[in-house]
Amino acid sequence: MKNKLINTLAFVGIALISTACSQNTQSQVQQPNETPDKPWSVKMVESEMARWPESWQLDFQPKLKWDYCHGLELQAMLDVYDRYGDDKIYEYALAYADTMVNADGTIKMYKREEFSLDRVNSGKFLFRIYEQTKDEKYKKALALMRSQFEDHPRNEDGGFWHKKIYPNQVWLDGIYMGAPFYAEYAFRNNEVGVYQDIINQFLMAARHTYDPITDLYKHACDVSRKEKWADPVTGQSQHSWGRALGWYAMAFVDALEFIPQHEAGRDSMIITLNKVAQQIKRLQDEKTGLWYQVLDRSGDEGNYLESSCSVMFVYTLFKAVRKGYVDPSYLAVAEKGYKGVLEHFITTDDKGMISITKACAVAGLGGKNYRMGDYDYYINEQIRDNDPKAVGPFIMASLEWERLQEVRKIVNN
């Protein structure tokens, strides 16, 4: 209750600032001009539950899978449940948890020995499932995933490999997949000794992927410089992929709230987050408020405005402003981006179901069907509607937007 009050008071202050500045920014940022009969976050959750009646079907799955997309979207759905209620949402998330987690705490389709950070993100929503049910199997499942970090392969500077099959590689995606779970587990279980390890994951990734020429973070880095996709000098991949930076950005705002303010290195995390925020602001498309699939080739032929990175950036900036990590001026960037998402990516069918369009289905580096990570690769990967990697962050961004509107009503009244 105390933390909620502090956050509300802080956001009221931000709302006062943004209201006072509204006359100056009116020409730049318009309010989203369509108000649904329900909050956008609720409409998207209801639409997804209608599209995929069984929660294991999320991410277009024909069979059971322990997948980071399920964790992402179900976490967002539980955020909606926490804010607006509706037991159907909770039961939907619980059904996946109950199906996938066995009575002894083992998890179907989860293989610890694969050392995949992706499989850890799948379990973040279990914290709240355990809180609600007090079923010990969820506590055991959380401990199982936490134990992965004890043996997970690392680079010499302590950075986790993205996966065992990707040795010596740091992917920005992986920071989101592992660090927020690690931080929340540490917070809930009083593991004060691991915060430095968590902070190091963020700062290590920044050191390895930052390109001073473009002033951007590249998708990944092979610290060993052995991969064909890696620059022989820096080890970095060729391009800055929008969603990779989106994952990294969201990881900051989600992990920081669990790291004590006095912890050494936390300030460095916030400095790096501000650097990311500056990049997001600089690369925002002036006309639409959105962001491109390949950030360092924004506006080039074949490149396109992509929904998943756009909603990730919007969510990050909204939350970073609310938490006081970045300057309140970034609120205008977030609002312009959110308006752009509603105008260019959100569609409504004749039944009232909403969809989010134009999301890159997948992008990676190396692997069996070797991916060089060149420009043509990124712009030619499959594009699809209602990809969870866009759906989940859209729900999260919408919740931040809705929270801001409620605070503004309080301020204006």
Give the positions of each predicted feature.
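Extracytoplasmic mature domains of secreted/periplasmic and thylakoid-lumen proteins
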Residues: G105, R112, S116-A179
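Oxyanion-binding "anion nests"
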Residues: A249-S298, G302
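Acidic/His metal-coordination segments adjacent to aromatic residues that form catalytic metal sites
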Residues: A50-W56, V101-K108, G159-K164, S224-Q238, ...
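Inter-helical turn/loop segments and adjacent helix faces that build the functional surface
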Residues: Y84, Y185-Q196, A255-D267, A320-P328
